[in-house]
Amino acid sequence: MSRVICLGEVLIDQIAEDIGVSYEQVSSWKPFFGGAPANVACGLAKLGTPVSLISCVGQDDAGTNLLRQLGALGVETSGVQVHPESITREVYVTRDANGDRSFDRFNGDEQTIFADTLMSAKDLPEHLFADAKFLVLGTLGLSSPQTSRAIGRALKLADQYFVKVIVDVNWRSMFWTNPEQMIKLLPVLLKHTDFLKMTEDEAKLLFRLTSPAAIAQAYNHLEGIVITNGDQDCRYYLGEKQGKHATFPVYSTDTTGAGDAFLAAFIHKIYDHPLTNLLDSKFVNQAIAYACAAGALSTLDVGAISGQPSDRQIREFLAMREAKH
């Protein structure tokens, strides 16, 4: 059976229980499972798509708990390395009155070395790539030399085993000691990328463009580009056609992981079909609508994982929307 591989950070999101206050004013924090690649993996598992995670955690309570939760959620974890000396990363997240989040700082005071920055290239499980259909990764791992080398080997394995590469930009300046470095490294990553997902702000920052078709023209090897814009819309260039889909309005509690839920749902919809289906406008529109619904539903609960919807919840939500129109 083929699978999806998600590669990258798994960590703890410490989310402020106080709304609309600064980091210094927060009175209490609540820990949640996090890390974009891990969020996508959990979203896929919940939707029923076979998925493995390749990552690195510390040999600490946080790392042990994350591994336990991954297994309980149905994510295959043979590719998760355990570093004996470095700690598992925690990110402190504040929220405004609309549920939109800000990433403030990490655990360990001024520490910059965490387990997820020390992924070993030689310890990547090659057998996972032999039966994989997609490799999903972000860009945060490129900020550390060792994990960047692991990403490089993963891309070579993906090429060797004809695995399609999906990149979610997931720009977070706080992960980089030199943010300009990421802009220099992105073109190298794009050479190995088949499908690219990013937010409108990321598209402006990295490409100075917001049109998926215009970006596809500049990088014509890309098979698909999706640009999300929060609660506004989603624009895409798939199957050599461009399109746009409005998001679904909901009363959001927490937007952490909404983009990850979107991506997991999109991959789930195309996983069981030949990629030639992306030439079918109806199929593409249904896949994007499904992904938009997943992203919206995920914001109804706090934390990136707890709000991730099931296939049934997404289908019922879409059916209800259809009935109203």
Annotate each language-model stretch with its function:
Residues 50-51, 77, 163-165, 225:
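Hydrophobic anchor at the start of a short beta-strand
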Residues 134-214, 232-233:
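Conserved beta-alpha-beta core of the PfkB/ribokinase-like small-molecule kinase fold
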Residues 1-76, 325:
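Glycine-rich phosphate/adenosyl-contacting loop at the front of the ribokinase-like
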Residues 3-5, 156, 208-325:
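Conserved phosphate-binding/catalytic region of the ribokinase-like
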Residues 68-86, 94:
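A glycine-rich helix N-cap at a beta->alpha junction
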Residues 94-145, 149:
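Conserved phosphate-binding/catalytic loop of the ribokinase/pfkB sugar-kinase fold
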Residues 127-128, 188-189, 218:
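Structural alpha-helical scaffold elements that stabilize or flank donor/cofactor-binding regions
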